[in-house]
């Protein structure tokens, strides 16, 4: 494997292009279960390179069932608590420092342990526009009702294929 073709062609580097997100910034999303999501780096802000999100679970059970993506890989890094990660074959009780990489097509799922808070990082590559998907799911958790067709369209548009 080799390095990709250069995307920056300058000679002296750039000043002012880095982006900082402070830990105390408010989350972009909150749902009734107490789960919050912080958009650390979106596909738009990384020019499509990746999307990185901090997912803080509240004590109520939360997380998607088994699914896969055709166009993006997804990785999980547990920061605190216990997160149940499904690797397509079994559920794994992941603890701080545990990491799971799921390539395109890999079946996976995640959920917190009921009654316990937990936190993890979600990394998508390339940086697909996952924000609309997350926002719609949080709207549904907050009472929005989707028709079956709207739900099906949402999943197809955002490369979410349930198994």
Residue map of PLM features:
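A short glycine-rich, His/Asp/Glu-containing loop-to-beta-strand
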Residues: 26-66, 72-73
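Short, conserved beta-strand element in jelly-roll/cupin
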Residues: 54-58, 68-87, 123-125
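Ligand-binding loop in jelly-roll beta-barrel domains
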Residues: 46-48, 84, 104-131
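Tight coil/turn sites that cap or link beta-strands
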Residues: 58-61, 97, 105, 115
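Long, hydrophobic/aromatic N-terminal blocks
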Residues: 1-41
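Acidic/histidine-enriched, glycine/proline-rich intrinsically disordered or flexible terminal extensions
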Residues: 133-163
């Amino acid at each position: 494997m080799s390095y990709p073709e250069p995307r920056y062609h300058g000679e002296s580097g750039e000043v002012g292009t880095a982006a900082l997100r402070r830990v105390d910034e408010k989350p972009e999303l909150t749902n009734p279960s107490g789960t919050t999501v912080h958009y650390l780096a979106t596909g738009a802000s990384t020019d499509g390179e990746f999307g990185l999100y901090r997912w803080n679970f509240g004590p109520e059970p939360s997380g998607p069932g088994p699914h896969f993506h055709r166009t993006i890989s997804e990785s999980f890094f547990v920061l605190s608590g216990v997160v149940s990660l499904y690797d397509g074959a079994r559920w794994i009780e992941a603890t701080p420092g545990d990491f799971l990489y799921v390539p395109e097509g890999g079946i996976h799922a995640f959920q917190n342990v009921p009654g316990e808070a937990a936190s993890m990082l979600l990394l998508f590559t390339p940086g697909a526009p996952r924000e609309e998907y997350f926002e719609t799911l949080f709207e549904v958790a907050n009472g929005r009702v989707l028709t079956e067709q709207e739900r099906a369209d949402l999943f197809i548009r955002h490369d979410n294929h349930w198994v």
